[in-house]
């Protein structure tokens, strides 16, 4: 099992923008030094607590500061961007990273982002599908382009000059394009079936109960079979909120205490998702009353925290429910205490993973 990381990120809105950007960059640089396989970075335009507004710009700032870690958008929210712009920008960063880029995509889940871009009342899933189809066509078809759609028409026919290169979008470094990765939230996700049919690979969200995470595998398997791909657990990434400490007292205080980053994270996530009518994501049973979905319940059921041996045991128990998967994605959280947060990443990479892979 490989180790990767993902961060939305999610920080207290009171913290300075410059400070949290530096902290998030330091987290990826540390992950690279510790041998993490990948780092996925989220993006949100209209959220002060989730302040990275462009995952591609953020990742570009890390190209010369990292050596081996693959850097992924987590995700580019396609309805909020013009497909031609994303095709060109992704091709550029893929060439700059020379094969270390992963193209994470989604329809976007932040409603205020959809609102500011004028997409609140549109079918954003339909926009997402049209956008990625346009992007793949731009990369694979010769110029001049003449792509028609419901939301975007893309052409360079009027101003195409082959001799000078005008009207031609650059293509990615990886052939035929960077690996496409999708985040999966909904239990028994039909969207995952469609993604797997196209050869895309999933990351299951870190704020889902284990039984809902487990529901993703049969959907991925079904999609792979329908698309003619091998359904291999090694291609399934599962995100999890984990805190590893040198002693149990510190683990519990930082991992579940009111002053810790995990408490802040899940308080924010619960408010957003429950406010958007999605309390079921936090329930282990859909018949569970909404009133039982408390913050303490969510922390106890979704955060893995403890000493090395305890965390290993908890991850094994988690896998007993989900089944095997290829990559454990360590969810990044605010560094309330930088030393404890860094130590957790070190223990995760140097002690927890070797024991899990024995």
Task: Label the model's feature ranges.
Residues 1-71, 177-178:
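N-terminal beta1-alpha1-beta2 module of alpha/beta enzyme domains
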Residues 38-62, 77, 109, 207-210, ...:
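Glycine-rich, proline-tolerant flexible connector loops at the mouths of alpha/beta enzymes
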Residues 3-5, 39-41, 71-74, 101-105, ...:
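Hydrophobic faces of well-ordered beta-strands that scaffold small-molecule active sites
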Residues 7-22, 76-84, 177-187, 243, ...:
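Active-site mouth loops of central-metabolism enzymes
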Residues 3, 35, 43, 62, ...:
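Conserved, mostly hydrophobic/aromatic
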Residues 32, 59-67, 90, 94-101, ...:
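Acidic (Asp/Glu)-rich catalytic clusters
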Residues 82-198, 214-218, 226-227:
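Internal, glycine-rich beta/alpha segment that forms the wall or movable "lid"
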Residues 125-169, 211-322:
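An alpha-helical appendage that flanks or caps ligand/catalytic pockets
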